[in-house]
Curated annotation (Swiss-Prot):
Homodimer. Interacts with WalK and YycH. It is found in: Cell membrane. It comes from Bacillus subtilis (strain 168). Together with YycH, regulates the activity of the two-component system WalR/WalK. It is a single-pass membrane protein. The transmembrane region is required for the regulation of WalK activity. Changing F25A: Induction of WalK-dependent genes. This is Two-component system WalR/WalK regulatory protein YycI. GO terms for cellular component: plasma membrane. Keywords: Cell membrane, Membrane, Transmembrane, Transmembrane helix. Disruption phenotype: Induction of WalR-dependent gene expression. Cell wall defect. It comes from the Bacteria.
């Protein structure tokens, strides 16, 4: 009888302790949430004080994937099927894989100077294998090149353009002095697979990270924040693509005594909250 009574007292005591600890945890959770909101509000206030402006940045949490993809090897049949083109590299064989095409057009293809971007996109879509998978990245007049990046579900797979070894899913058109396309290089990713779904930082989180890391200058403007992917290990045959936010920031600086508008670009890992790259 005494044991049953003692057992009941212990059970009640533990229930009271659980309720007390649960209540304390709830209060702490509420306080943490409020502190987080205060910090977020303080950051936005500080950015405003530094005259850093932005519009339309998404603050809603989203989910996304890391992606795996394989580097495509082009077959002899695929290369021979390209009309009015000839290869500038050795053809594939049993002991020689071709993962980077270098092709020359039989006749140079003229591009309109007025509509060069549209004309170049149309050329890639119609003359190049899987051309619809590529989207214009930039026109480099100094190098006489037009660069396209491969996309996944409509989003850019961002890549370095200053090193051929980082060329994993690109088309580069080469122009002559008459604004004609004479040749191109191509690499392609294939067999895309989504890995486990994970939470992504928001567009606003990515911009605030830049601010935390002192990357945003006073009187600068966040012009855009676009979703895409970056290869984490571009030199491997199987690529792991991480979701990123590509942020464009604009500000003015004096060059030779004159004000000049400068654009700066940042790439932020949307899974790991890290700044991957900065360039102008």
């Amino acid at each position: 009888m005494e044991w049953n009574k003692t057992k009941s007292i212990f059970i009640v005591a533990f229930l009271i302790l659980d309720i007390f600890l649960g209540y304390q945890f709830f209060q702490k959770w509420q306080a943490t949430g409020k502190e987080y909101e205060v910090i977020k509000n303080d950051v936005e206030h500080d950015m405003k004080a530094d005259h850093i402006t932005y519009e339309g940045l998404n603050k809603e949490a989203t989910e996304g994937y890391r992606i795996t993809a394989n580097q495509k090897s082009f077959s002899k049949e695929e290369i021979e099927a390209l009309k009015d083109q000839k290869p500038l590299m050795d053809m594939p064989s049993d002991d020689h894989k071709v993962t980077s095409l270098k092709m020359k057009f039989a006749n140079p293809i003229a591009l309109s100077k007025k509509d060069i971007e549209d004309d170049a996109q149309a050329l890639v879509s119609s003359k190049i294998q899987d051309g619809e998978k590529y989207k214009l990245w930039k026109v480099d007049k100094s190098k006489k090149e037009i660069i396209f990046f491969q996309t996944y579900e409509g989003h850019y797979i961002y890549q370095k353009t200053d090193n051929p070894s980082n060329m994993i899913g690109q088309v580069v058109l080469h122009l002559n002095g008459k604004n004609e396309v004479v040749s191109y290089d191509q690499t392609t990713l294939e067999t895309f697979k989504q890995i486990q779904k994970e939470s992504l930082i928001t567009e606003m989180d990515a911009v605030e990270l830049l601010y935390y890391q002192n990357q945003l200058k006073e009187y600068s403007t966040v012009k855009s924040c676009k979703f895409g992917y970056v290869a984490q290990y571009p030199l491997t045959s199987t690529q792991v693509l991480a979701p990123v936010w590509r942020i464009t920031v604009e500000y003015e600086k004096k060059v030779n005594g004159e004000k000049k508008t400068v654009q700066e670009y940042f790439t932020v890992n949307a899974l790991e909250s890290t700044i991957l790259d900065t360039d102008q």
